[in-house]
Design a protein with these regions (language model features):
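Bacterial N-terminal signal peptides
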Residues: 14-26
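Exposed acidic/Ser/Thr-rich ligand/metal-binding surfaces
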Residues: 33, 43-44, 52, 58-67, ...
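C-terminal "exit" segments of structured domains
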Residues: 213-271
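A short, amphipathic beta-strand motif
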Residues: 231-242, 318-327, 395-402
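Short, ordered, surface-exposed loop/turn motifs in non-cytosolic proteins
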Residues: 241-263, 326-346, 402-419
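Short, solvent-exposed S/T- and G/P-enriched segments that are highly enriched in secreted/extracellular
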Residues: 261-279, 342-357, 382, 416-433, ...
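Structured interaction patches on ligand/partner-binding surfaces of diverse proteins
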Residues: 269-271, 291-316, 371-393, 447-475
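Short Pro-Gly-centered beta-turn/loop motif in secreted/extracellular proteins
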Residues: 269-287, 291-295, 353-365, 369-372, ...
């Protein structure tokens, strides 16, 4: 599992090996289920075993095939007594010789059942390693091996010493089946393999390099321990000083292989300020999205299987209050504002005036959708409220009714002008328009005028709460 220095891990409980202390079956589903199922959840482990011809190569004095069968048999024995656990065995490359180049040589040899270690061991004694390496075909066939059970945890463990030999893409197949929720992120054990061998299998799932027999035994134990051990996560949301005071924010655990959200939990702290403990399936890898505004996303959160993980994030928040002016009725009606992190193009949130919104502490640009638009730079501070308002508008009343083309410009202090508004193109000039206080210019030509020189220019001033009437061409 990936570990990072940004997080704190406390209350750690050891998992041990698969053959060691009793492990609890994880009670959280592969789907985004926050409530426990009514009946105990079943975990199904499908062993996908490579029986290609290369498995007969020697490995520390004995064929890889014999080592793999022996280790797999011992593991099945060690798991035989676990409740709510079913095992299955699919093999590939064992029905046809390598010379046949058969790319559909895979079969479910032992279907899922509880306490079926003897069946698995008996079947292993009858199989022969001799054929091709159709990993992709075997993966896709495994989709039909798992019973239709939406509440179960489906786990696939691939044991192989070779790469795909059938011009297919096992990585794409694995991703596709994970997205379809056939199984969780697979475990892949490369036996007797060189280091670069694993680089081509890492995309399948969690890869382990068992270059030695001793390592193979350890890896097998570790994989099963991860599968069966209970894992919990508590998330502390702190202020700028590291105090865990933030809460009531949705936490989304996103499967970073499939991109699908697996869990949504609205953060909770008890009366003592402690974050509650969440049951999270450690067989997935996650990005955590803390749905503050704007959201905080941490890629590859380091959740360790069989541990009581505590993750800590700084998410100091303050409140933005969009305060409307004291003018009733407001000629604008409902005014909206667009809030962006200072200097950022993306919108953090759009809100109507009269509302309050929690924001991460920091500087923001608030664009007020008045006419003309206003931009305010504000600083949101931890635990404080900052207000943004705008001057009460006045109203422009163009009294002349002429068809034509016109625009309104704001007059700036440096005597430049900034476009604000276009009158209806070719339509009537008569209108009532709420505007911000300030100096403006109206430029208009009638539709029937025979030249640009017949343009009328009128300067006017808008005052809060007042109506300014403007006539065109002296009318």
């Amino acid at each position: 599992m990936v570990l990072g220095g940004l997080f704190s891990f406390v209350r750690k409980a050891g998992t041990g090996g698969a053959l060691g202390l009793g492990l609890l079956l994880l009670g959280s589903g592969a789907r985004a289920q926050n409530a426990p199922p009514e009946k105990p959840q079943v975990t199904r482990i499908l062993f996908l075993l490579d029986a290609s011809g290369s498995m007969m190569a020697p490995w520390e004095g004995q064929p890889r095939w014999e080592v793999a069968k022996r280790m797999l048999g011992k593991m099945a024995d060690s798991l035989n007594a676990y409740p709510n656990l079913e095992l299955g065995l699919r093999v590939y490359g064992h029905q046809f010789p390598n010379s046949a180049k058969n790319c559909e040589d895979s079969r479910l040899e032992v279907p899922f059942a509880p306490r079926n270690a003897q069946a698995i061991k008996a079947k292993l004694t009858t199989l022969k390693a001799q054929g091709n390496t159709p990993i992709t075909y075997a993966l896709r066939q495994s989709a039909g091996d798992f019973p239709a059970d939406k509440t179960a945890r489906n786990v696939l463990l691939l044991i192989t010493d070779g790469l795909e030999s059938c011009n297919a893409d096992p990585c794409a197949a694995s991703l596709d089946l994970q997205r379809k929720r056939v199984f969780l992120k697979p475990f892949v054990i490369g036996i007797g393999a060189q280091q670069d061998f694993g680089k081509q299998l890492e995309c399948l799932g969690q890869y382990y390099n068992a270059a030695e027999v001793k390592t193979f035994r350890t890896v097998m134990n570790d994989v099963v321990a991860q599968t069966l051990a209970k894992t919990t996560v508590a998330v502390n949301l702190t202020d700028a000083d590291g105090r865990p005071v933030e809460s009531n924010v949705n936490l989304t655990f996103v499967n970073n292989v499939t991109g699908q959200p697996e869990y949504n939990y609205v953060h909770y702290r008890d009366a003592q300020g402690r974050a509650d403990v969440l049951a999270i399936d450690a067989l997935q890898s996650y990005d955590l999205v803390i749905n503050t505004v704007p959201a905080v996303r941490q890629a590859n959160v380091p959740i360790r299987a069989g541990k009581a993980n505590v993750l800590t994030f700084k998410t100091p928040q303050g409140t933005l209050f969009l305060q409307p002016p004291a003018l009733t009725p407001n000629p604008y009606g409902a005014v909206q504002a667009v809030v962006r992190a200072a200097g950022a193009p993306a919108t953090a949130v759009a809100l109507p005036f009269g509302t309050r919104q929690k924001l991460l502490a920091g500087p923001y640009d608030v664009e007020v959708l008045t006419l003309p638009r206003l931009t305010r730079r504000v600083s949101v501070r931890q635990g404080q409220e900052v207000a943004v308002t705008y001057p009460a508008p006045g109203t422009l009343n163009i009294t002349t009714d002429l068809k034509g083309y016109g625009s309104i410009y704001q007059l700036n202090n440096d005597e430049s002008q900034t476009w604000v508004y276009n009158l209806p193109d070719g339509g009537s000039s008569k209108l009532n328009l709420p505007m911000q206080p300030g100096a403006y210019r109206l430029v208009f030509r009638t539709k029937t005028a025979l030249g640009s020189k017949f343009t009328d220019v009128r300067n006017f001033t808008i005052r809060s709460g007042q109506t300014t009437s403007v006539g065109i061409f002296g009318r």
